[in-house]
């Protein structure tokens, strides 16, 4: 859960360092490798929009939807028919941190969020991947494909549709 939250907060503000980027959508593959070299891969799609909205649609290995709008986080887990509602606090400082990410070279930026050192890789001037070592010392890589930037995304995309028969947990 903590990894999912960190990933969501990271990418809700992913494009903050790119001054002219207002929306971002892409397919992603997230690879998490632990110290024993065990690897778990997740895949799905992301849509994100300034100032602080994101929707992650995980399709494999399990279905999960994560919505962030301002300070509200909603996680919908169809396999267990559960919804988690959580306040994530103000992420503006994080947004500013990415906006001020340090350029390493033409295709690499370094950023810091709390205790995470994040590397943002660009390819053809688009966000290609993000890598970081999480709080459990897992190597995390989020690889993006089919990236679209500055396309119109309706704000309705970021409103979770909570099934009436799901259990709702407020944290």
Predicted segments with their positions:
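A short, Trp-centered hydrophobic/proline-enriched beta-strand micro-motif
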Residues: 20-37, 47
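Non-transmembrane domains of secretory- and envelope-associated proteins
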Residues: 39-41, 104-107, 111-117, 122-171
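Boundary at the C-terminal end of the N-terminal hydrophobic targeting segment
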Residues: 16-18
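Sec-dependent N-terminal signal peptides
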Residues: 4-13
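A mature extracytoplasmic/lumenal domain signature
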Residues: 30, 58-62, 70-72, 79, ...
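Flexible, surface-exposed loop/linker segments and immediately adjacent secondary-structure boundaries
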Residues: 78-115
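Extracytoplasmic
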Residues: 21-23, 41-43, 51, 61, ...
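An acidic-aromatic
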Residues: 45-93
């Amino acid at each position: 859960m903590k990894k999912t939250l960190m990933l969501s907060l990271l990418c809700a503000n992913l494009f903050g360092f790119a001054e002219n980027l207002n929306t971002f959508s892409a397919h992603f593959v997230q690879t998490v490798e632990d110290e024993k070299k065990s690897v778990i891969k997740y895949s799905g799609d992301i849509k994100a929009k300034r100032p602080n909205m994101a929707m992650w649609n995980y399709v494999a290995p399990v279905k999960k939807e994560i919505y962030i709008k301002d300070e509200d986080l909603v996680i919908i887990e169809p396999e267990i028919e559960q919804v988690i509602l959580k306040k994530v606090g103000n992420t503006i400082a994080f947004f500013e941190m990415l906006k001020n990410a340090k350029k390493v070279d033409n295709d690499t930026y370094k950023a810091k969020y709390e205790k995470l050192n994040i590397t943002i890789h660009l390819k053809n001037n688009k966000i290609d991947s993000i890598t970081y070592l999480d709080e459990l010392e897992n190597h995390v890589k989020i690889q993006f494909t089919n990236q679209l930037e500055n396309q119109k995304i309706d704000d309705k995309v970021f409103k979770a549709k909570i099934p009436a028969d799901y259990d709702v947990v407020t944290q």
